[in-house]
Amino acid sequence: MTKKKKIRVVTGGVFDILHVGHIHFLKQAKELGDELVVIVAHDKTVEERKGRRPINSMYERAEVLKALKMVDEVVIGEPNCISFEIVKQLNPDIIALGPDQNFDVSALKEELKKKNINAEVIRIPYAYKSDVAKTSKIIQKIVETFCE
């Protein structure tokens, strides 16, 4: 009797100030397969892309994600880049993109093909919309409420 191969889903993101939008996204990503691996953005990458350091360090964000039932493994990304080497090592069957991740799916698929990474790319749409389902909105609300 042959053992069925587990379907591995890989996703990545900042996941700073974890909120209900993140939870809904991670649940949907997990439903795509058997194992969910999350690549947490390196602090330097966050600073470069968002123009600010994250509220929680990459180690704190990784620890919070590891505590979630739907997350099987957490890896911290490389500084200042999307590391295709990490993705290749993780050997995903599916790469799940969040609704606010501004990747050109066609370009990403081409790059994966060049790197010999055979994974399906799936963009997960917003499952939960609210003013508190976006980290920047949470920060803005905190500043408006407590800093004026």
UniProtKB/Swiss-Prot annotation:
Q: Output the Gene Ontology terms for molecular function.
A: ATP binding; FMN adenylyltransferase activity
Name the source's superkingdom. Archaea
EC number from the UniProt entry: 2.7.7.2
Which EC class does it fall in? transferase
State the InterPro entries in the record. Answer: Archaeal_FAD_synthase, Cyt_trans-like, FAD_synth_RibL, Rossmann-like_a/b/a_fold
- Name the chemical reaction catalysed here: FMN + ATP + H(+) = FAD + diphosphate
Kindly list the cysteine pairs connected by disulfide bridges. none
An example Gene Ontology biological process: FAD biosynthetic process
Q: Does the keyword Translocase apply?
A: no
> Which residues are listed for ATP binding in this entry?
V14, F15, H19, V20, G21, H22, D100
Q: Give the pathway annotation.
A: Cofactor biosynthesis; FAD biosynthesis; FAD from FMN: step 1/1
Q: Name one Pfam family in it.
A: CTP_transf_like
Cofactor section: a divalent metal cation
Kindly state which keywords UniProt assigns to this record, in alphabetical order. Answer: ATP-binding, FAD, Flavoprotein, FMN, Nucleotide-binding, Nucleotidyltransferase, Transferase
Transferase in keyword set: yes
- State the NCBIfam families in the record: cyt_tran_rel
| Summary of subunit composition and partner proteins | Homodimer.
The free-text function statement in the UniProt record for this protein reads:
Catalyzes the transfer of the AMP portion of ATP to flavin mononucleotide (FMN) to produce flavin adenine dinucleotide (FAD) coenzyme.
Name the protein family: Belongs to the archaeal FAD synthase family.
Q: What is this protein called?
A: FAD synthase
Q: Gene encoding this polypeptide?
A: ribL
